[in-house]
Amino acid sequence: MAGKKMTVMDFKKYKEEGRKFAFVTAYDYTMASIVNDSDVEIILVGDSLGMCMLGYSTTVGVTLDDMIHHIRPVVKGAPDKFIVGDMPFGSYQESPEQAIRSASRILMETNCDCVKLEGGAVMAPTIK
């Protein structure tokens, strides 16, 4: 699948057909460009970059600016991949309005394909 960027509809079709796809994490241009030449369909720029790239002991200190700074080069390095940008702790829990502001910033400033947040059923009202 290298060379053809997947879409949400492609993933929906995969699900309907019971097909699997690969999802990896990358934090910079070099990592992303290597993945771009593979058959991996999705790259996550996760808040785990706090521990892997910034030396933090947890993800809690990762800021929205940190995420944007790392998502941007991944998008540039992997133009053929579906890029997911993680929303860091504290950027969406306060209110649905805060979540929309944060998600909008990530999407507009990085051109990633979607954002991800954590929280399960508790976050359902925010996602709606």
Cite the ranges covered by each PLM segment.
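Alpha/beta enzyme core
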Residues: A2-K128
